[in-house]
Amino acid sequence: MTKISKRMASLSSKIEDRAYPPLEAINLVKESSTAKFDETIEAHVRLGIDPKYTDQQIRTTVTLPNGTGQTIRIAVIARGEKVAEAKSAGADLAGEEELVDSISKGEMGFDLLIATPDMMPKVAKLGRVLGPRGLMPNPKTGTVTADLVGAIKEFKAGKLEFRADKAGIIHVRFGKASFNADALLENLKTLQETIDRNKPSGAKGRFWKTLYITSTMGPSIEVDIAALQDISQE
């Protein structure tokens, strides 16, 4: 049986078992972020889909207007001049076959992998290593591209790739506890709109099941989905 710390029990006691208006939920998450570091704020979205069917899968990207507050490590697999181009653009790792070899051995010192189209036959062989970690480059998410400078710039600025897991749940970080509430709300709203725009064609019945937000060390707080969808952004 999992033992709940006094700190978590105290924080959880302040959370009611109901869906909160978006801004109120965000303020509660910020108030619950009492760790001695800048906690990450995450959204956990349960959707009415069954990802084992190809027409009920969702994998896309979102560019958060206020970023995530995190620095991501980007690796690039390319050839020749493109390797130097990637490094100049800010890639943390860049290489050809030698990088493919190191990844095949389990060396995963990065959060995102970008590849040029001509290198995909070699990258495809890494599927067993990259696939389970959600790191396989994909044209749909902009991680298979010849425009390395543009892709690196976008992902470093806060563009995120996300997908629904086997249970139909999306997990996305959308800021830090140090962000002001309005910035977090704007990011969360952008995420909601992105998910709605990418609703799978095979989704049936109620699409949004639940939405919870939480900080790294804090309790989960349910958000009123309809209220979030009703917010208009200019």
Curated annotation (Swiss-Prot):
GO terms for biological process: regulation of translation; translation. Pfam families: Ribosomal_L1 (PF00687). PROSITE patterns: RIBOSOMAL_L1. SUPFAM superfamilies: Ribosomal protein L1 (SSF56808). It comes from the Bacteria. Keywords: Repressor, Ribonucleoprotein, Ribosomal protein, RNA-binding, rRNA-binding, Translation regulation, tRNA-binding. InterPro entries: Ribosom_uL1_bac-type (IPR005878), Ribosomal_uL1 (IPR002143), Ribosomal_uL1-like (IPR023674), Ribosomal_uL1/biogenesis (IPR028364), Ribosomal_uL1_3-a/b-sand (IPR016095), Ribosomal_uL1_CS (IPR023673). GO terms for molecular function: rRNA binding; structural constituent of ribosome; tRNA binding. GO terms for cellular component: large ribosomal subunit. The keyword Ribosomal protein applies. Binds directly to 23S rRNA. The L1 stalk is quite mobile in the ribosome, and is involved in E site tRNA release. Part of the 50S ribosomal subunit. Belongs to the universal ribosomal protein uL1 family. This is Large ribosomal subunit protein uL1. The gene is rplA.
